[in-house]
Amino acid sequence: MAEKTQKSVKIAPGAVVCVESEIRGDVTIGPRTVIHPKARIIAEAGPIVIGEGNLIEEQALIINAHPDNITPDAEDPEPKPMIIGTNNVFEVGCYCQAMKIGDNNVIESKAYVGRNVILTSGCIIGACCNLNTFEVIPENTVIYGGDCLRRVQTERPQPQTLQLDFLMKILPNYHHLKKTMKGSSTPVKN
């Protein structure tokens, strides 16, 4: 499969991205974002822009894929960017296709968030919850349990600043990191 254009991964200074992670397509990673080994970020239907201070854990999959009813060759649809805000946590094994994610959200382990969901800010999608509806999730909503029950919490989840600081210090000791960008569109070679 030949690609039409050069796809690029842009990693801001201050981000920690392990070499063992899989990042494909046009992906921009903001400062102070930590991407664990075995995390996957795939931009096949359009770019993915990840904001500042996000935590993407092992085996999390963030994918900007083509909708089921559109094939990649169908009249070349306009690429739609996936925008991820700041201070979000994508826990182990979660699957996220949401095209717009606000700030301070937590997608817990094994949770699934479909393409037509818009997460505002301060939301928690509980472990193993499957969210595949056409809706905007209101701010500070918690979705939990086997039946995906909902409630509104009074405050947003706290940003994971201490955990990010710890991981930014520890991960480079045990994993090779992808190089950050210095204002260019091509990766820096070793």
Swiss-Prot record:
Q: Which Pfam families match?
A: Hexapep
UniProt keywords, alphabetically: Centromere, Chromosome, Cytoplasm, Cytoskeleton, Kinetochore, Phosphoprotein
Q: How is it modified after translation?
A: Phosphorylation at Thr-186 by CDK1 during mitotic prometaphase creates a binding site for PLK1 that facilitates its recruitment to kinetochores.
- Record InterPro entries: DCTN6 (IPR027777), Hexapep (IPR001451), Trimer_LpxA-like_sf (IPR011004)
What GO molecular-function term can you cite, just one?
dynein complex binding
GO CC annotation? centrosome; cytoplasm; dynactin complex; kinetochore
Q: Which residues carry this modification: Phosphothreonine?
A: 186
Subunit comment: Subunit of dynactin, a multiprotein complex part of a tripartite complex with dynein and a adapter, such as BICDL1, BICD2 or HOOK3. The dynactin complex is built around ACTR1A/ACTB filament and consists of an actin-related filament composed of a shoulder domain, a pointed end and a barbed end. Its length is defined by its flexible shoulder domain. The soulder is composed of 2 DCTN1 subunits, 4 DCTN2 and 2 DCTN3. The 4 DCNT2 (via N-terminus) bind the ACTR1A filament and act as molecular rulers to determine the length. The pointed end is important for binding dynein-dynactin cargo adapters.
User: In which family does this protein belong, per the annotation?
Assistant: Belongs to the dynactin subunits 5/6 family. Dynactin subunit 6 subfamily.
Protein name stated in the entry = Dynactin subunit 6
Organism of origin is Bos taurus (Bovine)
Upper classification of the source organism reads: Eukaryota, Metazoa, Chordata, Craniata, Vertebrata
Q: Which gene encodes it?
A: DCTN6
